[in-house]
UniProtKB/Swiss-Prot annotation:
Cell location: Cytoplasm
A GO CC term attached to the entry: cytosol
Tagged with keyword tRNA-binding: no
Protein name per the record: Ribosome-binding factor A
Native species: Klebsiella pneumoniae subsp. pneumoniae (strain ATCC 700721 / MGH 78578)
BP GO terms, sorted: maturation of SSU-rRNA
Protein family membership: Belongs to the RbfA family.
Function as written in the Swiss-Prot or TrEMBL entry: One of several proteins that assist in the late maturation steps of the functional core of the 30S ribosomal subunit. Associates with free 30S ribosomal subunits (but not with 30S subunits that are part of 70S ribosomes or polysomes). Required for efficient processing of 16S rRNA. May interact with the 5'-terminal helix region of 16S rRNA.
Keyword set includes Cytoplasm: yes
Keywords, in A-Z order: Cytoplasm, Ribosome biogenesis
Secretion signal span: none
NCBIfam families for this protein: rbfA
GO function terms (MF aspect): ribosomal small subunit binding
Amino acid sequence: MAKEFGRPQRVAQEMQKEIAIILQREIKDPRLGMMTTVSGVEMSRDLAYAKVYVTFLNDKDEAAVKAGIKALQEASGFIRSLLGKAMRLRIVPELTFFYDNSLVEGMRMSNLVTSVVKHDDERRVNPDDSKED
């Protein structure tokens, strides 16, 4: 029987908290002027690699998102050294940052569903309009 919540998941959860604190307090890069949120961390089974998923507050500008990810990648060594001080791990994992667009996609899907429901309600109120198609 496999463990449902093994060591990689527990380390990832703690690492998510620590990286969020580091990004909030320690990183002073002007390319990260927008608020950065750590939405998730995935660890490899041997705890040597971590995929860090981040979102930005004003993520409408594609260039700003790419610049933010690039800034995080360039600061990954510094973040990794601070992680080593904050967490007692035998191996501090190599960090790779990715933009997490799941929240944006979720909001887009929610807006689509809302607009379809609204359009359907309008068609029920005015059934004559649908016969013109």
